[in-house]
């Protein structure tokens, strides 16, 4: 895959079905060993994302979705925007690259898109404590655990510990 054949652009609602078709398998793969497949079946689906999750996320002021595409097909996506509690920080809600397109710099290019969209804002995100692949990616990009913790409870009795990461572009506290 040649980097020159990859285009990064803002997604439009018409793109959502193709984005979800790419996003869903890599999302499931990212949760392998963290949540059982039957639980994933209960909490996410491409149809749900196209009809509800993507539109609701993007209704938040300042939020956007960007996609990486090759040959007119999405091979990566990211969603980000101002954090509700701290609008001076930009939260990355999602960054996924199709499995066969990983390790070609696409995730880094999508992350750079978010960084350039808000050049002076600190970037924050949540990462499942057990998601070592994602944690490694962000740590290589100079994100650091920032002391925040969160337990995601997608279903009754299902608890998924998360840690907060932050890329400091202002002076870190302390």
Curated annotation (Swiss-Prot):
User: Annotated Gene Ontology MF terms?
Assistant: acyltransferase activity, transferring groups other than amino-acyl groups
The text of the family note is:
Belongs to the acetyltransferase family.
Keywords from the UniProt entry: Acyltransferase, Transferase
Q: Spell out the protein name for this chain.
A: Probable N-acetyltransferase Rv2775
What InterPro entries does the record point to?
Acyl_CoA_acyltransferase, Bact_Acetyltransf, GNAT_dom
Give the organism, scientific name. Mycobacterium tuberculosis (strain ATCC 25618 / H37Rv)
Keyword Acyltransferase present in the record's keywords: the answer is yes
> What is the E.C. number?
2.3.1.-
Domain named N-acetyltransferase: which ranges? Answer: 6-172
Enzyme's top EC category: transferase
